[in-house]
Amino acid sequence: MNLLLNYELFLAKAITFLFIIFITPFIFNIIKRKRTDQKKFKIILLEEKYKNIKKDILLSKMNKLEKKKWIKEEKKKDKEFEKKNKNNIVTLKKKTLFVLDFKGGIHAHEVIGLREEISAILLAANKDDEVLLRLESSGGVIHGYGLAAAQLERLRQNKIRLIISIDKIAASGGYMMACVADYIISAPFAIIGSIGVVGQLPNFNKLLKKCNIDVELHTAGDYKRTLTMFGQNTELTRKKFCQELNLTHEIFKKFIKKMRPCLDIENISNGEHWFGTIAFKKNLVDEINTSDNILMSKMKEKYTLLNIQYIYKNKKLENFTSFIIENIKIIIIKIFSYKKIL
């Protein structure tokens, strides 16, 4: 008996200790995050990054005497350039290419950063500046990707040229974003298209009946709930659900046709996807290339290359918990979701 009591006391102490070690810091992080603004912009001057890479490679090929001579010559060139352009505002006259990255998940949560990045660009951009968005997304919920596409439209409305580069995939909702661009670039084997809508969910009604479990589902309005996981689905509700899918598909098609009038929309909106080279022949993209080549060519054209990133200053614990929670949510959504997925 004493042994059992001692064990229970030990167990209580162990649980208390684990709570203090793991849960308390997490609670403090949440409180701190509420009190302080954890968001900020990170701006990277890409041409400096490439120049430093070039410098490191060149120096690695030289012996000590060559390195010394090369560094001396470079310093001399820099001094001459500074002296020559001392009274000239050269940088303000140069065109700027703002580089953004969007790697979208099923809910397009990344639009939180995209909207801030676009707002920042609109505040600072000149009329000849351009935006390059490196896009990677296989699509997701319509309201998420609809908002992402609407954010990109802000650039078109302000007459700022938008280039979208697809190195891997821009399918479904991803292509909804891509079609907003003035110019679309795709890698040869990138996946493009999938202009369709899907909605699915399991129904456990028969299983629950076998277990003698009743489900109460009451709605005000005939179509407040169409398909349900636990209630009994009828032909009427199934028909309504399919109507909603078709309506969403029609809106999707109209949006793409508006953004890219050159497309034969009925031919390419059957849900099929293609590799970049085939998508080019179907006018889904304008050029076969990679984002890296675009950056190099713009650098040769003397553009200032600015990579704009809106980031959160999350702690490692927050990153880890967010990663676990997000992946669990994605698995559950893929199994049970009835939302309209682009």
From Swiss-Prot:
> What domain of life is recorded for the organism?
Bacteria
What class does this enzyme belong to in the EC scheme? hydrolase
Q: From its record, what is one biological process in GO terms?
A: proteolysis
Location in the cell reads: Cell membrane
What are the TM regions of this chain, as residue ranges?
10-32
Q: Does the keyword Lipid biosynthesis apply?
A: no
| InterPro entries reported for this sequence | ClpP/crotonase-like_dom_sf (IPR029045), Peptidase_S49 (IPR002142), Peptidase_S49_N_proteobac (IPR013703), S49_SppA_C (IPR047272)
What EC number(s) does this enzyme carry? 3.4.21.-
Location of the active site: S172 (nucleophile), K224 (proton donor/acceptor)
Question: Which GO cellular component terms, listed alphabetically, does the Swiss-Prot or TrEMBL entry include?
Answer: plasma membrane
Q: Which GO terms describe its molecular function?
A: serine-type endopeptidase activity
Membrane topology value: Single-pass membrane protein
Q: Which Pfam families match?
A: Peptidase_S49, Peptidase_S49_N
The entry's keywords: Cell membrane, Hydrolase, Membrane, Protease, Serine protease, Transmembrane, Transmembrane helix
Q: Which family does it belong to?
A: Belongs to the peptidase S49 family.
Report the NCBIfam families cross-referenced here. PRK11778.1
Which PANTHER family does this UniProt record tie to the protein? Answer: PEPTIDASE S49, PROTEASE SOHB-RELATED
Cited function: Possible protease.
What name is this protein filed under?
Probable protease SohB
